[in-house]
Amino acid sequence: MAKRGPKTVGVSYRLGLTPGVFMESLVKVADNSGATLAKVIGVPHYKAVWRRIPGAAVGDIVIVSIRAGKPELRKQVMRAIVIRQRRPYRRPDGSWIAFEDNAVVIITPEGEPKGTEIRGPLAKEAAERWPKLSAMASIIV
């Protein structure tokens, strides 16, 4: 039977953005942490029907495996935040936005960004959800 009452405690309402980064996607690492290319290997807290491929949208956390970069970072499994996606998504004002690439920023297990700067633009949705990322970004779109 369906649950009644308020939604789960601790989960803020989030507009349903179109997922653009899925399992096995190769994404660019857009910070100066030392990694350059990563592969998405998981989406935490994703619940779906059987055999559906998990996906993440701008501002979501994903689990990535570092594929290219500094030798000490390669083959490491880390958490990251999606900051750009190629798949177009609609904003509440009616405009559609899409970026040139799929990009992530590596974060520590505590949720702090590992790098100190973000290369390229940062989506407004990710900046509103993660204030520390907006402080690192030079361009917010």
UniProtKB/Swiss-Prot annotation:
Which Pfam family is an annotated match for this chain, by its short name?
Ribosomal_L14
tRNA processing: present as a keyword of the record?
no
The source's superkingdom equals Archaea
Swiss-Prot/TrEMBL GO biological process terms: translation
* GO CC terms of this entry: cytosolic large ribosomal subunit
Which CDD domains does its entry note? Ribosomal_uL14 (cd00337)
Functionally, this protein is described as follows: Binds to 23S rRNA. Forms part of two intersubunit bridges in the 70S ribosome.
Q: Which family does it belong to?
A: Belongs to the universal ribosomal protein uL14 family.
Query: What PANTHER family does this protein map onto?
Result: 50S/60S RIBOSOMAL PROTEIN L14/L23 (PTHR11761), LARGE RIBOSOMAL SUBUNIT PROTEIN UL14 (PTHR11761:SF8)
What does the annotation say about its assembly with partners?
Part of the 50S ribosomal subunit. Forms a cluster with proteins L3 and L24e, part of which may contact the 16S rRNA in 2 intersubunit bridges.
Q: What is this protein called?
A: Large ribosomal subunit protein uL14
User: Can you name the source organism?
Assistant: Thermofilum pendens (strain DSM 2475 / Hrk 5)
What lineage, starting at the top, does this entry show?
Archaea, Thermoproteota, Thermoprotei, Thermofilales, Thermofilaceae
